[in-house]
Amino acid sequence: MAPQLLLCLILTFLWSLPEAESNVFLKSKEANRFLQRTKRSNSLFEEFRPGNIERECIEEKCSKEEAREIFKDNEKTEAFWNVYVDGDQCSSNPCHYGGTCKDGIGSYTCTCLPNYEGKNCEHLLFKSCRFFNGNCWHFCKPVQNDTQCSCAESYRLGDDGHSCVAEGDFSCGRNIKARNKREASLPDFVQSQNATLLKKSDNPSPDIRIINGMDCKLGECPWQAVLLDKEGDVFCGGTILSPIYVLTAAHCITQSKHISVVVGEIDISRKETRHLLSVDKAYVHTKFVLATYDYDIAIIQLKTPIQFSENVVPACLPTADFANQVLMKQDFGIISGFGHTRSGGQTSNTLKVVTIPYVDRHTCMLSSDFRITPNMFCAGYDTLPRDACQGDSGGPHITAYRDTHFITGIISWGEGCAKKGKYGVYTKVSNFIPWIKAVMRKHQPSTESSTGRL
């Protein structure tokens, strides 16, 4: 009787199951109306799928072993894991003087360049002008096992022995307006600009112009001078060195018997506002060769001094060592002028400025059909359709270092206009520092400093 009772109970239970299921469980379509859940990457046979860093370690927390399975490389795994655990300790760039940072868990490690040590590469083993200019803001001079810093004219050495402090409102090489107004846009400006030079015949052409440059805003190129002929037309450029001296190219002096100088202008067409400065004398380097443009340098002495302001400031004159070892090893220089904006066109009414890279001497010499003498250097791009041609000869090639702008070259000559594989050729100012100083010292009026307010 007991076995029969047990069998009846089992049959009764099985008979009731479909009804229970219909009461407890909902159909899939109906259930989805109530249970809204975002699908994850997890699914059937997930462990058999290839590793995915987003699925394993971002959507979910992963282990180091899971990360290793994804990267399949110990070095990559360590680099990822150190950042994954507690963030990137190198994001603040803690390593000084070019040191390389490697992230760790709760720490970082700096690999220092030669001659530097310390957790952040902050200590010099021994001072040398060859390493980061001896930490000098301007000029560095080796003294036994140490270095001695000094500054350009119109600056004094700071109390720290490294920095240079401007002594006047219009100290050389200061470009306050450009730094304040366009600091954020400078990287695009640097990356997007280019200059190469023009050849009109089989000889190097002294006629230079800037093509596709940006407008130089008022006060952004304060050292720019422009040379006008008897008719008041632009034919060359120049660089303000002092209240009465303007640096230019020697071949510019041979182009016109009558020369006037204008400074502080960004729109040369506004004749009612421009003030013409008369030339007293012009000093052309005695070794200048018109056929080759070697020694293409000259200094103009004005009859009346320039009145400095926020928009009119001289460029700083570097030492030869500083120019060769520091300035000309920077990535870019800056040229400016009122030259033509297209081949065969008219000179520009507005001042244009272009940032161009230095070109190594070997590449420079290979690119030219003419001799590149030791008194010349190349700058510019070899392919981009941006150029420097007629009208800007004699103008400035400026290089900035620690917010001070130094004259490094004079726009001289070139081959082709936006011609592939050709660069602009510039007079190398560092070769002529003693000559420039000698001319200025020999002919300097006693009233220059007070009138020019250096």
UniProtKB/Swiss-Prot annotation:
Residues 1-20 form the signal peptide. GO terms for molecular function: calcium ion binding; peptidase activator activity; serine-type endopeptidase activity; toxin activity. It is found in: Secreted. The vitamin K-dependent, enzymatic carboxylation of some glutamate residues allows the modified protein to bind calcium. Residues 41-86 form the Gla domain. Residues 86-122, 129-164 form the EGF-like domain. Disulfide bonds join 57-62, 90-101, 95-110, 112-121, 129-140, 136-149, 151-164, 172-316, 216-221, 236-252, 364-378, 389-417. Pfam families: EGF, FXa_inhibition, Gla, Trypsin. It catalyses: Selective cleavage of Arg-|-Thr and then Arg-|-Ile bonds in prothrombin to form thrombin. It comes from the Eukaryota. Expressed by the venom gland. PANTHER family: COAGULATION FACTOR (PTHR24278), COAGULATION FACTOR X (PTHR24278:SF28). Heterodimer of a light chain and a heavy chain; disulfide-linked. This is Venom prothrombin activator porpharin-D. The lineage of its organism: Eukaryota, Metazoa, Chordata, Craniata, Vertebrata.
